[in-house]
UniProtKB/Swiss-Prot annotation:
Signal peptide stretch: none
Lineage: Bacteria, Pseudomonadati, Pseudomonadota, Gammaproteobacteria, Legionellales
Main location: cytoplasm
Organism: Legionella pneumophila (strain Corby)
Protein name as annotated: Exodeoxyribonuclease 7 large subunit
Keyword Cytoplasm: yes
Quaternary structure note: Heterooligomer composed of large and small subunits.
Molecular function terms, GO-annotated: exodeoxyribonuclease VII activity; nucleic acid binding
Subcellular location: Cytoplasm
Gene expressing this chain: xseA
Length: 443
């Protein structure tokens, strides 16, 4: 037996194991079948959680649950128990101290989702009558999403294809993680404070329930509900539903579908305009024909046909001119609108912007090259001046005038008394050096 290891009592050993289980392992989620469920008068619940090959004792204390919580749980039922491991010291049995129980298959997150969904639905946040109508032709569209994700690219490409003249404002936010809900709320508040957008898109790509959990935040749902600007959700894929989808004024299956929902199609607008012009022209023709019929009817009734015909023909000519003028003005007005749309579409052509940027870049390169040359010349001149100054004050320059430097053992001598007869000294000249022996010392 090793003398270096302490000898423990059973109580001490169990206490150490209990401390390790409680402090090192942390919260666990365990799925299994309830067995040996006991509900004593103390209000605590005790049961065994087992699978086909193993089991663990569980304790669900009164202060952790409501009195009616386990009424629907019985022996043989599959559950997921969440809690921390501990040790019952008296018998040396480790056990799970349960903090929460849900039915197996539902999952903790799904249960929270359903509870919040029921709560908000009971408050009327999902009611169709409180949802705002989307604008038919928005001038400015706000996008709340990650600026680096795939969703933003899908949205921007769809907007550029369907309605390129719309202005777009991006309100960046994280869409996953602990800080994402608050950032999404802040972006919604900022967009409402700006009052520049007619509609907002709240979007992110697909993912698991954990990835999309930021959009199941209660505070975010309430912020969507009180938004003065209509909110369109485009979260995940077609089968994904979040609390934000239920509260939003319109739920789109994907970010691309959200961009489609908030924009008209330019081609459809032109078709509508063409149809309106055709209908107006048809109405004018019908009106003229109707007036002609009335005129013919009156001609048959009047006693003086020529005078009556002349009067009504003048009236008919006047009305015809007025109708043709009104039709022409309407057509010209819509042609101007089409020209404006065409000009705006041409201005948004990226090729023109790229050429402008190229010219600006070339000018900047030429300017930078000139400035670098000037700076290098200045540094060269300064270096030459410094070298001249250093040479003037250098001890080696003094040697050029016939002076010498005397040293012994690599130490410079300043007085004759620093050397003794027989010493070997070194004399440094402007060119070369001399090794000399001291034969005489004079003051």
């Amino acid at each position: 037996m090793s003398s270096q290891l302490p000898i423990l009592t059973v109580s001490q050993l169990n206490r150490q194991v209990k401390g390790f289980l409680e402090n090192e392992i942390g919260l666990v989620h365990v799925e299994g079948e309830i067995s040996n469920l006991s509900k004593p008068s103390s209000g605590h619940y005790y049961f065994t959680l087992k699978d086909s090959t193993a089991q663990i004792r569980c304790a669900f204390f009164k202060n952790r649950h409501s009195s009616s919580l386990l009424r629907n749980f019985n022996d043989g039922q599959q559950i997921v128990a969440s809690g921390k491991l501990s040790l019952y010291e008296a018998r040396g049995e480790y056990q799970l101290i349960v903090e929460e129980i849900v039915e197996a298959g539902m999952g903790v997150l799904y249960q929270r989702f359903e509870e919040l969904k029921i709560k908000l639905a009971s408050e009327g946040l999902f009611n169709p009558e409180r949802k705002k109508t989307l604008p038919r032709i928005p001038e400015t569209i706000g996008i709340i999403t990650s600026p680096t994700g795939a969703a933003i690219q899908d949205i921007l490409s769809t907007l550029a294809r369907r309605f390129p003249i719309a202005r777009v404002i991006i309100y960046p936010s994280e869409v996953q993680g602990q800080t994402a809900p608050q950032q999404l709320v802040n972006a919604l508040k900022l967009a409402n404070a700006h009052k520049r957008c007619q509609v907002l898109i709240l979007a992110r790509g697909g993912g698991s329930i954990e990835d999309l959990w930021a959009f199941n935040d209660e505070y975010l749902a309430r912020q969507i509900a009180i938004s003065e600007i209509p909110v369109v959700s485009g979260i995940g894929h077609e089968t994904d539903f979040t609390i934000a989808d239920f509260v939003a004024d319109y739920r789109a299956e994907t970010p691309t579908a959200a961009a489609t929902a908030v924009t008209p199609n330019c081609i459809e607008l032109f078709n509508i305009l063409d149809t309106a012009i055709y209908r107006l022209h048809d109405a004018i023709i019908r009106l003229i024909k109707g007036l002609q019929l009335k005129l013919n009817h009156l001609i048959d009734k009047i006693a003086s046909p020529r005078q009556a015909i002349s009067t009504y023909w003048q009236t008919l000519d006047y009305l015809e001119r007025q109708l043709i003028s009104a039709m022409t003005q309407f057509i010209n007005l819509n042609i101007n609108k089409v020209n404006i749309f065409s000009t705006q579409l041409q201005a948004s052509n990226p090729k023109i912007q790229i050429e402008r940027t190229k010219i600006q870049l070339q000018q900047l390169i030429m300017q930078l090259t000139q400035e670098i040359r000037i700076k290098v010349n200045q540094l060269k001149n300064q270096l030459s001046t410094n070298l001249s100054t250093l040479h003037a004050v250098s001890p080696l320059a003094t040697l050029d005038r016939g002076y010498a430097i005397v040293s012994k053992n690599q130490r410079i001598l300043f007085a004759a008394q620093q050397a003794q007869i027989g010493d070997t000294i070194n004399i440094r000249l402007a060119k070369g050096s001399l090794a000399c022996e001291v034969t005489q010392i004079k003051d």
